[in-house]
Amino acid sequence: MPAEVGRWLRTVLAEVQLATSAVAAGDVARFDEALLRARRVYVAGQGRSGLVARAFAQRLMHIGFESYAVGDIISPAVGAADVFIAVTASGRTETTVSQAANAKAAGATIVTLTEMESGDLVDLSELRLLVPTRPPRGPESEQHATTLFCQTVQILFDVVCAMLQQQLHQTDAELSARHSNLE
């Protein structure tokens, strides 16, 4: 059993390394720039993609951004100068596509993280981060369904947060002061 654990750790880490290295660094830099210009940031996704998106919204809040997970009852109206981030491996998740269309109609900048090079959601987006986690652009994963996609997006979000924290000169103490103290 311990050998099996080691094999899976090596497999998962190798897959994530291949997938993250295939993401265009220029697109990540443009994503970072869009966030720096944003008045507010909204994240959307369903299932595990939604959980990864919500974790990103929380970390953005720690850094000092006004950020919301779409669907939470405290989310204000989206509008111009806002950034709407859609996370969906398929790029076709109906709820997320509909939310992005509504945000676009309200004047928000749409950023999509997806495995797909084209589709309705990509067409709505000012910026698409292609997250290649399936052949032919990405690795053949031994993990179930969109597991590699979610892992890769989480790593990309963590990288962007590290960049933003540095660019905004936010210390760990400042982030910790914004962390929930109700736990």
Predicted segments, located by residue:
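Alpha-helical scaffold segments in soluble metabolic enzymes
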Residues: 11, 15-18, 30, 102, ...
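Hydrophobic packing residues in well-ordered alpha-helices of helical domains and bundles
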Residues: 5, 9, 28-31, 53
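Generic secondary-structure signature for well-ordered alpha-helical cores
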Residues: 18-25, 65, 133, 161-170
